[in-house]
């Protein structure tokens, strides 16, 4: 909510529905399990809960989204049987349910502990944008649509365009 680039972004409306609600609805539509929004903001909690969704309040002191998810899982695990977590970015309303389901399928098929969904970077400006996390993969990824990530990075000094992707979401088995 307090992002410097676009304050309040999760609550901005697209076709009368907040961005965060669009993402929540996409997650729910997968029917993979219970969906929670982990947030530090009462406004986001209110938005999700007024539409019948589940939210978990977390600390404002987290350095990363992974830290926030860890806290949320710690709070939820005593009341829910959590096998894995799919971490969706709350500001990616165009994520497709098909992509979420494909990530789930591939992580299960490969018996992985973690998986990350990414996409080709088509806009050259994204390469130099330090606000966008990118991942470097290898030729195996190009052939099979999965491979170990070589590295995650924000800086762009040393990368090969051919093997660089923008991150969308990750799935973590617990």
Model-derived features with residue positions:
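Conserved donor-nucleotide/metal-binding helix-loop-beta segment in metal-dependent transferases, i.e.
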Residues: 97-126
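N-terminal glycine-rich phosphate-binding loop and ensuing alpha1 helix
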Residues: 1-39
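Short, high-confidence coil segments that cap the C-terminus of an alpha-helix
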Residues: 32, 80-82, 110-113
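Active-site donor-binding loop signature of nucleotide-sugar glycosyltransferases
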Residues: 16, 58-60, 90, 137, ...
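Anionic-ligand binding region
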Residues: 120-170
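Short phosphate-binding loop-to-helix
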Residues: 36, 42-88, 92-105
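Conserved small/polar residues in nucleotide/adenosyl-binding loops
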Residues: 172-174
């Amino acid at each position: 909510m307090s992002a410097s680039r676009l304050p309040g972004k999760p609550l901005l409306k697209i076709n009368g529905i907040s961005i965060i609600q669009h993402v929540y609805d996409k997650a729910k539509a997968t029917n993979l399990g219970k969906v929670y929004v982990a947030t530090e903001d009462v406004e986001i909690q209110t938005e999700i809960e007024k539409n019948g969704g589940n939210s978990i309040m977390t600390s404002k002191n987290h350095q990363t989204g992974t830290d926030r998810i860890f806290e949320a899982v710690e709070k939820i695990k005593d009341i829910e049987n959590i096998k894995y977590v799919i971490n969706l970015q709350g500001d990616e309303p165009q994520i497709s349910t098909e992509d979420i389901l494909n990530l789930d399928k591939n992580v299960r098929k490969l018996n992985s502990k973690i998986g990350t969904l990414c996409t080709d970077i088509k806009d050259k400006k994204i390469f130099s944008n330090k606000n966008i996390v990118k991942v470097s993969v290898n030729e195996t990824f190009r052939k099979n649509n999965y491979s170990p990530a070589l590295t995650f990075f924000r800086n762009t000094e040393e990368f090969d365009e051919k093997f660089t992707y923008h991150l969308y979401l990750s799935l973590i088995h617990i």
